[in-house]
């Protein structure tokens, strides 16, 4: 969960910064934002650019945000077990050994991130290591390794890029119409109105688009649960999810939230990056 929220937050920040830059370019160069083909190309460049910048930064930002400590050389039996388990599961699914890190948190959680299947990160909380049995922790690790093997981070990036493109395009298209009507008597667009309307619409459309990205995130969680069940057995995966039902609510942020094993509760399931635990457990029982 922490993974997704960090990705989304970083992506939003990058897109907003690029949006400001784009508006400045319009103002300085005198380019007309009304050209649909040019606007669409520009929206795609900035939309996908924001997503891929977020993806490339995800590993370092995730470690920094949680204060994760990378295991270079295992110092105790728990770290040995953690490295051996991730290594074995990675070999089973055919990916390179991820960087493994531990971060200090009472939450029972873990997340994976990274731009490449063979250059990724798996991080687990001290709360998970202290409160889960080895079988349960093994299932959680299998869930995260499955996210990496399935290329979920890249797929999420592509989806976010498409969403960003349409958000930028629609907001500027509508803003151009509003600005033109507002200043029709002067025969030109009111750039201040254009800037203001486009920025507000980006925030509104970005929020609405989050329903799409959260739907995909929930869909991906079911697949990661099923793949983890195939790796370690569905009873271990069910036991891990049952443990999460009585755990603390996680405090992961942004993009990391989406790729964690456990997600925050929301007022509506439509805004949740993870399906309700009961639904995930029921899905596993029906396998």
Swiss-Prot record:
NCBIfam families referenced in this protein's UniProt entry, alphabetically: PRK05457.1 (NF003965)
Chain positions recorded as Zn(2+) binding sites: 143, 147, 221
EC number in record: 3.4.24.-
Cofactor(s) the protein requires to work: Zn(2+)
Cofactor-binding details, from the entry: Binds 1 zinc ion per subunit.
Stretch forming the signal peptide: none
GO (cellular component) term, any one: plasma membrane
Gene Ontology molecular function: any one: metalloendopeptidase activity
Keywords: Cell inner membrane, Cell membrane, Hydrolase, Membrane, Metal-binding, Metalloprotease, Protease, Transmembrane, Transmembrane helix, Zinc
Membrane topology annotation: Multi-pass membrane protein
Keyword flag Membrane: yes
Recorded superkingdom: Bacteria
Name of the featured protein: Protease HtpX
Active-site residue numbers: 144
Localisation: Cell inner membrane
Transmembrane region(s): 4-24, 36-56, 158-178, 192-212
Family indicated by similarity: Belongs to the peptidase M48B family.
Coarse class of the protein's main subcellular location: membrane
Any single biological process term in GO: proteolysis
Organism of origin: Vibrio atlanticus (strain LGP32)
